[in-house]
Amino acid sequence: MPISLGNAFIKNFLGKAPDWYKVAIIAFLIINPIVFFLINPFVAGWLLVAEFIFTLAMALKCYPLQPGGLLAIEAIAIGMTSPAQVKHELVANIEVLLLLVFMVAGIYFMKHLLLFIFTKILLGIRSKTLLSLAFCFAAAFLSAFLDALTVIAVVISVAIGFYSIYHKVASGNPIGDHDHTQDDTITELTRDDLENYRAFLRSLLMHAGVGTALGGVTTMVGEPQNLIIADQAGWLFGEFLIRMSPVTLPVFFCGLITCALVEKLKVFGYGAKLPNNVRQILVDFDNEERKTRTNQDVAKLWVQGLIAVWLIVALALHLAAVGLIGLSVIILATAFTGVIEEHSMGKAFEEALPFTALLAVFFSIVAVIIDQELFKPVIDAVLAVEDKGTQLALFYVANGLLSMVSDNVFVGTVYINEVKTALIEGLITREQFDLLAVAINTGTNLPSVATPNGQAAFLFLLTSALAPLIRLSYGRMVIMALPYTIVLAIVGLMGIMFFLEPATASFYDAGWILPHSGDLTPVVSGGH
């Protein structure tokens, strides 16, 4: 029976999302202007942040771009922020946007090499605990020199490869043309294997995700806010590494111990092993690939290997913006592996562009946070504390809590600017400023693993094409990150409270780093 035009509009709104979800979004859109104009803009701002987090939490029901985008458009329309402020945020974060557009697409053209390497690792290491540690350590090591988003893009690319290989065989379809998002053709016997395999991949991805945070906090190139903090403090690569080490080294080792423990104890959704049937399929696939590999395929692997070397060197030496290095990877990889048709290249951009659009919406929410000064009460309260040791601990905690809610790049930037202003005005000494910069950097990087909105890499993982395939939801990510959140946050706080000041003093005595005088760079304007 045909439906009326009115019902058709309702049915089309947010498509297949549940009715209660559609009602919730419409309710948000009605409530926000009322709260903004009639009650309090500050309250309306926090309400908007909570609603946006809700859309992220429901990412498996509906991609957050549409509901989050509607909320952002309304916020701009009613004057919670301005298009100019949103543009300012996007311009300030152009490197992150370029990275998503080009680097993730560049990784797509290297997936044969990545699948080749990681298949060897996956099949070579039988112990799940050792395998988890390998993934966590590799992600941490790479994130210290590359960007965490790049590392996660690599891991996602590999995991989709592994998943689709098994799914094809389990569905009885030929390797060539197959839709790995449909489970209809899978028998009950293999369905159990599939569920176990999903749990196995989920745990590896979460270990790798936390690994990016463990490594990303240690160096000035690991996360975008690290660069901003290092720039404001006038630190170079070596000094940044040394100043962070009293906090980052204990955290790193405790993170690896946590990784091993959750696997051994099989808690928080960890501990799933690779099912034997799946292992056999991957072994058979690897053997088949080896037999059918032509010289042309070998040449492609060599080219991709050389491009991988170029990628690591270029990123470690900061030869260009990350996104531009990604563009060079696309050009080199396609030129030397013979991918020259436009439609073949288009597939590479499918994964990252929806997320790039979502991130643009995210930055418009950040613009609201800036214009409505949502974090100001917290910042003022912490700066008002007289005792230096308490101030350090509070800065770490406040940064950590706000980074769980908002983007850690934004939180780190806002805080370092406020502290820089306090230094210029003579409210704190240069020595205290350097210690606070460490507290801000570690505070934004470590506790923010608690939720996907804190870390861009986690958000990318949650909204990737892989998340629904392996049933990785917002809630599940929060639960799986919980043991890491507790350990990283507490060990980081202990480092700030007990190790940072004495260790920094001993670094000065040893001559590894020198105390800075009042030399300053100008404060970054706006939010970033």
Curated annotation (Swiss-Prot):
Result when mutating residue 147 to E: Loss of antiport activity at pH 8.5. No change in activity at pH 7.0
GO cellular component: plasma membrane
Spans traversing the lipid bilayer: 24-46, 96-118, 130-163, 240-262, 298-317, 321-340, 353-375, 390-412, 478-500
UniProt entry keywords in alphabetical sequence: Antiport, Cell inner membrane, Cell membrane, Ion transport, Membrane, Sodium, Sodium transport, Transmembrane, Transmembrane helix, Transport
Annotated site location: Important for antiport activity: 147
Subcellular location: Cell inner membrane
Name the record gives this protein: Na(+)/H(+) antiporter NhaB
